[in-house]
From Swiss-Prot:
Its main location: cytoplasm. SUPFAM superfamilies: (Phosphotyrosine protein) phosphatases II. It comes from Debaryomyces hansenii (strain ATCC 36239 / CBS 767 / BCRC 21394 / JCM 1990 / NBRC 0083 / IGC 2968). Residues 33-192 form the Tyrosine-protein phosphatase domain. Belongs to the protein-tyrosine phosphatase family. Disulfide bonds: none annotated. One of its GO terms (cellular component) is cytoplasm. The active site is at 130 (phosphocysteine intermediate). The keyword Cell membrane does not apply. It catalyses: O-phospho-L-tyrosyl-[protein] + H2O = L-tyrosyl-[protein] + phosphate. Keywords: Cytoplasm, Hydrolase, Protein phosphatase, Stress response. It is found in: Cytoplasm. This is Putative tyrosine-protein phosphatase OCA1. It holds the Pfam family Y_phosphatase2.
Length: 196
């Protein structure tokens, strides 16, 4: 903040107070449903142009795209200009990279692939996202929490926190509960410190 944007005043206790006379020139706006998950691991809905200043400070190396549709072109351009690798995990299903419906749950193979990318510290800092940052992102983060040893009540509470007033999807919660965490192959030499 420049001196023209703020003035320093002294109060009765001789401590300094900063009075802001005009707003900052750069707006820092996080993506929809943004939240840190673990150190250098974040979740959100699809970032847009107004979120680029915020994302810049995260120094992202990888974005894990879980939506069943292609991301917006400006999002892909931003990733390309900033050397951010985008992993299109949500566009695949058991059959092919086509015919994936937005309302379909993620397959176990898709969740497994997403978790293996998350459990590799070489991909960090990493953002996990889908269109709104709710159900698909919530599924993967819920399965990650199970991998971390969280109890199901805590996993469900975190999932529901991001689904809003419409609530969660019971089928998603059942998928998180039944997911075979032992199917995830993790290289112990590449695990993030918070997973050990």
């Amino acid at each position: 903040m420049s001196e023209s944007q703020s003035e320093i005043e002294h109060n009765n206790n001789n401590s300094k107070l900063t009075k802001i006379s005009q707003p900052p020139t750069v707006r820092i706006i996080p993506p929809l449903n943004f939240c840190p998950v673990e150190k250098q691991l974040y979740r959100s809905g699809q970032p847009s142009i107004i979120n680029q200043s915020f994302l810049q400070d995260l120094n992202l190396k990888t974005i894990l795209w879980l939506a069943s549709e292609e991301p917006q072109e400006d999002f892909l351009d931003y990733c390309s200009m900033n050397n951010i690798a985008v992993e299109f995990v949500g566009l695949m299903n058991e059959y092919s990279y086509q015919n994936v419906n937005p309302w379909d749950a993620l397959s176990e193979d898709t969740i497994k692939k997403a978790l293996e990318l998350i459990c590799n510290k070489e991909n960090y800092p990493l953002l996990v996202c889908c269109g709104m940052g709710r159900h698909r992102t919530g599924t993967v983060i819920g399965c990650l929490r199970r991998l971390q040893g969280w109890n199901l009540a805590s996993v469900s509470e975190e999932y529901r926190r991001f689904t809003g007033s419409r609530g969660g999807r019971i089928m998603v919660e059942l998928l998180i509960e039944s997911f075979d965490i032992n199917s995830v192959q993790i290289d112990p030499t590449k695990m993030p410190g918070w997973l050990t």
